[in-house]
Amino acid sequence: MKILEIIPQLSSGGGERFVVDLCNELSKEHDVTLMVLHSLDKVDFYLKEVSNNVRVVSMNKRMGLDIGLLFRVYRYIRREKPDVVHTHLRAIMYISFAIMRKNGVMYCHTVHSAADKEAGGSFISSGMRKFCFHRQIGRPSGRERV
């Protein structure tokens, strides 16, 4: 199975630690790519702990809301054709365009903090998270997602 894990950055947080551990374990039996939205030049706290079996891709997100990143992430998903796209933290807002064009990909999102903290932000980012929520991306649906 091809799995794409997406996280904003590899800073020293608990969500980041979880994603690195998850990628390392999944890579024992699956083809795993870890997409980091921000540049690895700035924050790479956990990069050395990512298994050599995990492909790491940096999308070099610009400061603030990077609209172009929506399309770069979509093109990457379309080109690589993962079976599962799993977002973490605030990365969910950058897969909204890809979700609209599903193409047989299973999307899921993990909330790593209090939901109200993660749901904050600008009108655009909170709107994108609501869009994903209404399409059952990142909320329980009564059946296992991955």
Tell where the protein language model's regions lie, with residue ranges.
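Membrane-interface segments of envelope glycosyltransferases acting on lipid-linked substrates or membrane lipids
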Residues: 1-143
